[in-house]
Amino acid sequence: QRSLVGSEMCIRDRNISVLFLWAMSAIAFDSPGKVSPKVINEEVWAAYDGFNSTFLDPGKCIYKTDSSFESAVDRHNGAAAIWCQPIYWDMAMNAYKLAEAQKDKARKKTMKALCDDIFAGNKAHYANFDFDDNNENTGWFIYDDIMWWTITLARAYELFGDREYLKLSEVSFARVWYGSDKVGDSGSYDKENGGMFWQWQPIRNPAPNKFGDGKMACINFPTVVAALTLYNNVPERRKQSSESTPKYQTKAQYLEKGREIYAWGVENLMDKKTGRIADSRHGNGSPAWKAHVYNQASFIGASVLLYKATGEKSYLDNAILAADYTFNTMSSEQKILPFERGIEQGIYTAIFAQYIAMLVYDCGQTQYIPYLERTINCGWANRDQTRNVCSGEYDKPLQPGMVVDSYSASGIPALMLLFPIF
């Protein structure tokens, strides 16, 4: 395996480090003010089981929009958003890794079956992962919807070694970067001015993207995460494709693409003094400086992956700056992660969990553990105890039986799976 760059900053054995980090967090929050009782290991699994019992359609093995639906029929009738489904698959893979770390063979087997079922269910529902199918119900019609899947498919390959996952991840990356002959779009990548466009329009018979069209953080930094995750997993000596729109890249090409898009993002979407990430920029206009947790998250993940690949400390510094902004400016006075009420925005904490874990575990930034623990304990204490389901407003009780969406409910179990006590 590739040697870890910057290893003096890294915690190599994640399984050993978890207990130490949580012990340190207990000391850090032995301070004035009310602190909820600590979550124990059994509750981690109760939270994840409660989430799945409430939101996973057992027949289709995809997730529902909210608890009011009996099943996940389609986009307009009970199925959670296409771009959020891979975040739920990430949670299942994290559950598998946790069971493995705990040497719980029975639960590990169950979680592996769940991971397989979620992939199969989503493949069946979403056009057999034909990324050139742009129907607006079960197809692909926004660039970032595809790229979130690119990332998780690459992670699934990294964990399980199934080559179908890698093939789909690379094909989807290429589809976003270069566009689709079938759909007729020109691709997300702006070869003239850099960065990634968010969408093609119209969805049917699209016109080429032009200067001034939106370049959102939610496509740019996930593109970096995808490129670097693929960089970590494709063969070392792969030959460069001779096709004008190749279906795969070499390791060097993935790294180059990741570095290029990241550099564009830093120049156009990052406040270098504070670590705030803008939501978007259109042409030479001022960035839209509304900060969202998932944009902070994907920027942190992109920064960590580039730091590990190159050893360049500026990437790590950027990740820390963005994390500090999330906790010190965006979060509550108690450093509890914020909740946003927009459509699907409840998923932001689950995305943040994935990437702050990389900063904590891979780069030894343990200072964030107490704040994550505070969010977990607060959210779990306010759960609906009949279903073991949490809401996204972590400091407010969720009443028994109240309708709650899967996006908002995902945050606490996602954090618990990555920051458990065992």
Where do the protein language model's features map onto the residues?
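Single conserved hydrophobic/aromatic residue that forms the stacking wall/gate
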Residues: 1-13
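Sec-dependent signal peptide recognition
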Residues: 12-22
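Bacterial Sec-dependent signal peptides at the C-terminal "C-region" and cleavage site
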Residues: 23-34
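CBM-like carbohydrate-recognition segments
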Residues: 33-144, 159, 179, 186-187, ...
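Mobile, glycine-rich extracellular loop/lid and propeptide segments
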Residues: 140-153, 160-172, 176, 214-217
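Aromatic- and glycine-enriched pocket-lining scaffold segments that form the walls
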Residues: 166-260, 264
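Noncatalytic carbohydrate-binding groove/subsite architecture in carbohydrate-active enzymes
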Residues: 221-222, 226-290, 297, 302-305, ...
